[in-house]
Amino acid sequence: MTKSIIAAIMTMNLTATVAFAQTDVHCHMIPESYMESLKAHGMEMDEGFPIPAWSAGEHLKFMDEAGIQTSVLTMPAPQPYFGDGNESAGICRRFNEEAAALKSLHPGRFLFCAALPLPDVDKAIQEARYALEVLGADGVKLASNSCGQYLGDPELDPMMEYLNSRKAVIITHPHKPSAVNGQLVSAVPLASYEYLAETTRAILNMVAHDVLVRYPDLKVVVPHCGSFLPNALPRFKGLLPVMTAQGYMKAVDVEKNISRLYFDLAGTATDDVLESLLTITEPSHILYGSDYPYVAAPALAGARKSLESRLALHGLDPNDIFTDNAARLFGAGIPVREYGDRIVRLAEIDVDPDKLDEYLCFAKEVGMVSMKTEPGVIGLFSMQDKETPSKVYILEVYADRQAYEAHIKTVHFRKYKVGTADMVKSLRLIDTIPLLSSSLNKTAVR
């Protein structure tokens, strides 16, 4: 094997499996206190579909099974404003304090972006200050609109000014728009298409008001694979010169606004969607999001595996998407993975051709069990030489020496070693040095 082939294998395989270190930036905390508030006003179905059951225990169980280290919690839709600003402020305060308590109870597992009682801007600023400066919130969550007040509305500028002073992360999420007529937004569930339109509407309104240029230290996370923005932004940019020349709009810096946006992959991140998203952003601004608990855990498991297998095809490093981009965005809230202590081994094995099939079964089993049950085993991949199928290569990647030593003492490794002893004709270890993910990606993915 040449060095370039080894690098390619490590990029497409090693980065496709990150053991228990992933970050989910799109998931929801739905405490009983929030549900009680909705029920008191008959608003449980305001978004057109039932709000799922949630508990911290079930959320942690999902995270453990999915290999998610950290989840960033936000309040779901609807926005808890029922005509009384004080009541809304109280609901948001209780939510934020419960989220802060959960973060404290499970260090490193939960972060949270605070709920704000919009459309009351003064109360929203007060709650943002309390959440960020006292509770230790990791950002804020803003609805696409609150009672028709959309992101980008000049009335929100004082709040944006404060958030900018805190260099805040803003997670946005679509909410039910005001209906044009009695049937337009209720004919089909909002999540089917109107949520995508709603997000696009809100973000374009921010761009049209140059919000992220005027407040350049804000970082805004756009949900659901960018919604319709990859299609809407080219049209917006194309029409902008005409609109400004006619006096309908002020000149804005579209590219600078877009550069402040981050995009989560909650929803359906198909090949076409990924390709489209990459026309408006760069890989370092793409993040993993599950939309748990609105999407059931079993469905998420299948979707996530499918996503992992496709990312490299688009020049995307799964380590960046699932972990490192979020760590850079949220800073100290998420630990950045270290590469220096990794152990990387490449074994070249000559197998008895008559026993090859049996050997491959052993190798496949030990690889699957090891990566599923041992957090320190980052990768264990078996490959056959195309010209000489009985020549097998095994790429082994361990978090550190301790993880390697623990691995070779496991029952499943001993089963593999003893079971294949008479199948292996020779074994040669190729010494390697682990590369940083970024340089490895540049070397191999072209």
Q: What is each stretch, according to the model?
A:
Residues 2-4, 23-25, 30-70, 97-105, ...:
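Mid-to-C-terminal alpha-helical segments outside catalytic/metal-binding sites
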Residues 7-17:
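Bacterial N-terminal signal peptides
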Residues 26-30, 173, 224, 407:
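Histidine-centered divalent metal-coordination motifs
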Residues 29, 118, 174-178, 293-295, ...:
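Short glycine-enriched loops at secondary-structure junctions
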Residues 44-85, 109-117, 138-142:
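Divalent metal-dependent hydrolysis catalytic cores, especially in the metallo-beta-lactamase
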Residues 49-54, 80-81, 90, 117-124, ...:
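Acidic-and-aromatic substrate-binding clefts and catalytic sites of carbohydrate-active enzymes
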Residues 133-287:
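Catalytic pocket-lining loop regions of alpha/beta-barrel enzymes
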Residues 335-392, 397-414, 425-446:
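Short S/T/G/P-rich N-terminal loop/turn motif that feeds into the first structured element of a domain
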